[in-house]
Amino acid sequence: YKGSQIFAFDFGGSIRAAALGMGGDWQDLGGALHAEEGDSAAVALQPLARIDNAGERAWAAEWLAAMLAGEGMVIDPAAKEHLWSALTSLASAPPAERTLTGLAVLLQSQELKQALAPYLICGPWGRLLDAEQERLGEASVQAFETEGLIGASSAAAVLAYLFHRIEGRLDGSPTMIIIDEGW
């Protein structure tokens, strides 16, 4: 109903028709990994776009640390300092340059750069996570197809970012979050 919002995480496309029928957006997260370059319909995420805000920068530092730990990196105080320094420098760049590739250029640790490589535009997950401009629906009904994402090493990073974005949209209006066939 008017003023409410729905976020649905789907597996197998069972919510697609309902979401589109309600005037919502349906995003195929796994399909974005295999989309052709320049496909304007594919989901494209820019997790570092808002790091000029100190709270967003702190969130990004934690998100990156978790993502890199998933790649086998030991995130010690030195690694955290490298991440924070690069994020702080990147925060002053124009929004279109606040990408994971932009972060990699500024990182002073070769090990962190190597661990970040799969998430850069030239890596297997870059088409989804290293956009210069975010393409993610803004409708009050959002459905995210996760089937093609399940099993991918990027799944945790993608879902953590999406839940962070959803958290930013929680404004007191009635909200439903659906996790269909969750794991």
List the predicted regions and their residue ranges.
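P-loop NTPase nucleotide-binding module
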Residues: 1-9, 159-165
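Short, polar loop motifs at secondary-structure junctions
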Residues: 11-15
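P-loop NTPase motor domains
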Residues: 16-25, 29, 33-183
